[in-house]
Amino acid sequence: MQLKNNYWIFTKAISKTNCYKIIKACLKQSKIKGTVANSKLKLRARNCYVSWISEDWIYNLLNPFIHTANRNANWNFQWDWNELSQFTEYTKNQFYEWHTDQDNKPYAADNKMINLRNKIRKLSLTLQLTDPAEYDGGDFEFKWFDVEIDLASEFQYSKQKFDDKIKTVLVKEAKELGTIIIFPSFVWHRITPITKGKRQSLVNWSIGKPFI
């Protein structure tokens, strides 16, 4: 899917007071090692700590930005539910390699969480909770094909030709405290290794019916 806008950003959208309030609420939750697809722990792909939180006031704070980005970026994706929010903490040498947030199939029809059944992640949100002066590294980066490729003729391309068409984008503004970045969940992104200090963020996914 070729997009006009691969992400939408709201710089310093959330006040410092609310950022610290979110951190305080999240630190009360149990912390575990972050996992990758299918809940497998793969330290070569991801090394960080996470906890989970579901607070109505956090959704009420963030959802208006999701609706605005969805409209202004011309995605207009159907979605009707938020997953649990994930509080993520990276310290020195921790990272999250290239990945997408969208699985290759919907949540199971018999998922114990009724609101997840038969749905996929449509939009991803990351809220920056740490002042950029408190850490080094931990950059937020995207990558995508710079031009649309005819998938029917993919086999004609060498790996080098594909690599030449991949664009990597460093989102410098994403480091600002209180900044929200929203993007389609199928877009590739990563967090580069932390070299000093600690980076904290809140991540959430808006889910809906699979694309047709």
Q: Which ranges hold each PLM region?
A:
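Catalytic core of non-heme Fe(II) oxygenases with the double-stranded beta-helix
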Residues: N70-I212
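Non-heme Fe(II)/2-oxoglutarate
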Residues: M1-T88, N93-F95
